[in-house]
Amino acid sequence: MPDYRSKTSTHGRNMAGARALWRATGMKTEDFGKPIIAVANSFTQFVPGHVHLKDMGQLVAGVIEEAGGIAKEFNTIAVDDGIAMGHDGMLYSLPSRDLIADSVEYMCNAHCADALVCISNCDKITPGMMMAAMRLNIPTIFVTGGPMESGKTVLGGMEIKLDLVDAMVMAADDHCSDSDINDVEVSACPTCGSCSGMFTANSMNCLAEALGIALPGNGTTLATHADRRHLFEEAGRRIVELAKLYYEKDDEGVLPRSIATVEAFENAMALDVAMGGSTNTVLHLLAIAREAEVNFTMADMDRISRNVPCLVKVAPNSKDYHMEDVHRAGGIMRILGELDRGELLNRDVKTVHASTMAAAIDLWDITRTDDEAVKTFYRAAPGNVRTTEAFSQNKRWKTLDDDDANGCIRSVEHAYTKEGGLAVLYGNIALDGCIVKTAGVDEEIFKFSGPARIYESQDAAVAAILGDEVKSGDVVLIRYEGPKGGPGMQEMLYPTSYLKSKGLGKECALLTDGRFSGGTSGLSIGHCSPEAAEGGNIGLVEEGDLIKIDIPNRTISVDLTDEELAERRQAMVAKGKAAWKPAEPRTRKVSAALRAYAAMTTSAAFGAVRNVEQIEH
């Protein structure tokens, strides 16, 4: 039976100094021997998805102490990708994920924490904390801040739902009036919470349910709704139970690596493609699996994406639905239930709240359960009042959306497409693969060919699009924006949004070794690996080369022979130190912190995780 980790600093004569310091934090003699639970919060006033988390750590801490534990809260950084978007601030977003993972590891190991509650919400914070949880492998529960309510405004005499992507697209559309743009801007993000569509933050918070490390409703219960308080409280109660099961009952089944097995990662990816999640989830799942020491690769993702249908289309893949609508339709447990009915789910994996995923679905799937409390829970509705306060309203829909043919969540029989909402493409331009969110692509352009328009920075591409240099039929190719080349693998939400602004959203493709925001839709193909800065063939493409994209057959290629590519490679290598770099110097400032990330990071095909062996040797 394992000792409590905290015993290292709370027991023994030689720890008198440490105990003296523990006492200075408020601990008493009778507290030594209780499980010390770390509460990793991520409150910040910079990020709407985190602005309401200030008191959440102490809410959880109070419940932990009532349940017999000792809670110690600390904070991590949190970058808002939307605010950092479109300028050099985006260079810091992906690297922040690894810093967050490190900070949680540092705090928990330095202070010998016995268990962990992760309070996260937005794009890099949830995956960063997940990486830390797998790395630490101590009992852990995730409880996130919850999604924002969708924006609503009246345009042209009609009320419409909207989000921040609508504001970006309209701002660059010369046909939109200043008045309409202002109406959308002030209405797009009405409350605290993670942006209201199936963007990266909400995708990851939903995947936490599928991985089994968060409670039902975590991914879809609105940040403003009173029901969300119960998730925080239950997380506090349950983490003490998990800690005691492990340290006092020797139950290793409650540990993150026992829960997040390869079968659980398969479930998470099945959910991801079924709900048309953000392409960033691919990066993060690969990184989290690596920390969990699970062999889960792009090949596994490709296999799952071919077998699992797309059951959900939420903004940005649809104008009809946002996260509040997914919740009304039964949330993630309903989607997992539909996958289970289609025999597309591993039912026997463990969770932090139920013995198996099958047991959880039987209780929480609104189409199976007779529990009125569960059905009431999923009728939680938006309050439609501008606020930054959590738990500020308790509105309910009169009915649930259980229409499996035309509702927000469809059955396998009524799927939008037979294959999932994410796809991995391979070819001579992406030997290690690249990612496209098919749920956001019009099926008419699943096959697309066009001349490459080469840009060696996001800024250059944006200028060309806004300057009307990009024409219908073009393939906008943005390179040297990968994990090493950026560095930091910028998101390309502005280029994709501006293509829509110019009426080219369905008439052009965009290919990059960078990545895309969860708010991106259209024929946007990212994570092209190997990246240009690592000698990938994307660095050999020249202006006007024909790019061929074939989503049904999962291929992407430049129309060059192997011999032609070899000749170009030889010419590139001959440039010496100038090889595999932008032809023209870029003005961006790359700090020492970013250079350190670039020196250690790996390909997007491996999650853009750091590999210290690259600098050790």
From Swiss-Prot:
Question: Per the UniProt record, which EC number(s) apply here?
Answer: 4.2.1.9
Q: Which SUPFAM superfamilies match?
A: IlvD/EDD N-terminal domain-like, LeuD/IlvD-like
Pathway linked to the protein: Amino-acid biosynthesis; L-isoleucine biosynthesis; L-isoleucine from 2-oxobutanoate: step 3/4; Amino-acid biosynthesis; L-valine biosynthesis; L-valine from pyruvate: step 3/4
Enumerate the Gene Ontology biological process terms. isoleucine biosynthetic process; L-valine biosynthetic process
Residues annotated to bind Mg(2+): D81, D123, K124, E491
PROSITE patterns from the xrefs?
Answer: ILVD_EDD_1, ILVD_EDD_2
What catalytic reaction does the record list?
(2R)-2,3-dihydroxy-3-methylbutanoate = 3-methyl-2-oxobutanoate + H2O; (2R,3R)-2,3-dihydroxy-3-methylpentanoate = (S)-3-methyl-2-oxopentanoate + H2O
* Keywords for this protein: 2Fe-2S, Amino-acid biosynthesis, Branched-chain amino acid biosynthesis, Iron, Iron-sulfur, Lyase, Magnesium, Metal-binding
The record's comment on cofactor binding reads:
Binds 1 [2Fe-2S] cluster per subunit. This cluster acts as a Lewis acid cofactor.
One GO MF term, please?
2 iron, 2 sulfur cluster binding
GO CC, sorted alphabetically, is: cytosol
User: Any idea which residues bear N6-carboxylysine here?
Assistant: K124
The set of disulfide-linked cysteines is none
Give residues annotated as binding [2Fe-2S] cluster: C122, C195
Cofactor names from the entry are: [2Fe-2S] cluster; Mg(2+)
Q: Which residues form the active site?
A: S517 (proton acceptor)
Q: What does the function comment of this entry state?
A: Functions in the biosynthesis of branched-chain amino acids. Catalyzes the dehydration of (2R,3R)-2,3-dihydroxy-3-methylpentanoate (2,3-dihydroxy-3-methylvalerate) into 2-oxo-3-methylpentanoate (2-oxo-3-methylvalerate) and of (2R)-2,3-dihydroxy-3-methylbutanoate (2,3-dihydroxyisovalerate) into 2-oxo-3-methylbutanoate (2-oxoisovalerate), the penultimate precursor to L-isoleucine and L-valine, respectively.
PANTHER family, A to Z: D-XYLONATE DEHYDRATASE (PTHR43661), D-XYLONATE DEHYDRATASE YAGF-RELATED (PTHR43661:SF3)
Describe the family membership recorded for this protein in Swiss-Prot or TrEMBL.
Belongs to the IlvD/Edd family.
Put simply, this protein is called Dihydroxy-acid dehydratase
| Species of origin | Hydrogenovibrio crunogenus (strain DSM 25203 / XCL-2) (Thiomicrospira crunogena)
Q: What is the lineage of its organism?
A: Bacteria, Pseudomonadati, Pseudomonadota, Gammaproteobacteria, Thiotrichales
